[in-house]
């Protein structure tokens, strides 16, 4: 906010329901704020409009777009949420399949993606004064849902102190553009505020499926997510490092049991932030209650992939539980804050599940807890042993088995490894493309 020269008005910017910033002012003596409408934008250069249509396999589809002009300046639409991708600084937004932007005449570079199922397309377009059109045609490298696999982001936050105040409907295009079939935004605390409790009963029709879950936070014991119930666990937070409920003394096992009694799933989120959690200097990175809860069978799911943790270190810990014969299903969540400007894309880490029958929330949760799943931050993996898929049991006394692995990746990967009892028993480097078959 800024005062005017005379000191009788305060000027500030605020985002509206169309996720567009507005210039406003309010008297220092109070009263209703005024919106100052911008009648003309002076671009200091001639401009043109560009209508962008997007297809995937010949059908109109939502996509993620990043556009820059000849000077490298981002080109964005006049409304809707705009993000800056936190790792590479790429400014992006989502299109439902058609969008219009305005830009200085000259060349613009358009980068379009559709989740992990299609390689990115980069296209240069010349903009002239007046109206211009372009159609982007992306092709799938793998049609996951056609083979019964569905992608989910089980941990992210709709609103978390950012510039916009989003409604659930505002991210349906985002989910579709990223190829996410089911999303679980988690209600969570922000300090001593408990956000979005009213959204726990939210229902939407059609695809993608959007349901709300809960993040339960004990900083001391470790953070949990609960998905699959519309009831909230209380308290949301407790223990050391909190200015509320700081002296509350309870175990993480309580919310884990609460979820199980409600027919829901719960487990630890962003558990390990280091590459090797078993070194003496890094073992404190493992949440304090996770090992005990895991050994005692309290943990239903473990978030293997998350933006803020190390997938290799988390997977190493997960292998230790599996080696003890403890069935613990893998999950994943991006943990992005959707109303932030600087944030990663929703679904940047995700879990694919192959439910039995059509995709519903219940069939998804059943498939997830049965281990009919794989976690990914890019490559998609279809693995079978003696004809059995992930989540099934191979009953054999033979020391050798037949296996197949099909990989479908929008980006190159370094190598493929197969583990038995936490040890690498087969490995090969990637070559000759991103989508390969092994046996």
Give each language-model segment a name.
Residues 18-25:
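Structural motif
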Residues 149-330, 334, 339-341:
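Catalytic cores of extracellular degradative/oxidative enzymes
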Residues 34-49, 55-58:
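Beta-strand-rich domain onsets/edges
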Residues 27-31:
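Short loop/turn segments that connect beta-strands within beta-propeller blades
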Residues 10-13:
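Residue position within the beta-strands of beta-propeller blades
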Residues 55-75, 79-98, 107, 112-139, ...:
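C-terminal functional module detector
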Residues 6-8:
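Short coil/turn segments that connect the beta-strands within blades of beta-propeller domains
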